[in-house]
Amino acid sequence: MSGTFEIYNDKAGEFRFRLKANNGQAILASEGYKDKSGCLNGVESVKKNAPDDARYERKASGADKFMFNLKAGNHQVVGTSQSYASEASRDKGIESVKNHAPDAKVVEVGN
């Protein structure tokens, strides 16, 4: 399975990416980058680190919300998930990133 990394400019003029699964659902989102090359480096870091389970920081935020961060080898967060209603659904989200990120294509979108 491969997903799609969408590169876009946010309202503040920063470059961001989101990883979408085959069904079109966003499964990982980035922080803002000042330039496109930094954003593309972030995409490459996600592709490289996604298969490694040790790179995932599993978190529980209040009110039974679960999420995860994907970290690079330098411990920097390179992607953040949405909030999930259960630990099991969060773990499925991690598996989805592992399956979709390594071979995902990169496209630029308008927003």
Swiss-Prot record:
Superkingdom as given in the UniProt entry: Bacteria
Coiled coil: none
Keyword Transferase among record annotations: no
UniProt KW keywords: Repeat
Cysteines engaged in disulfide bonds, as pairs: none
Sequence repeats: 10-58, 61-109
Pfam family, one: DUF1508
The keyword Repeat is annotated on this UniProt entry: yes
Matching PANTHER family: PTHR40606, UPF0339 PROTEIN YEGP
Family the UniProt entry places it in: Belongs to the UPF0339 family. Duplicated subfamily.
Protein's name according to its UniProt entry: UPF0339 protein in ptx operon 5'region
Provenance organism: Stutzerimonas stutzeri (Pseudomonas stutzeri)
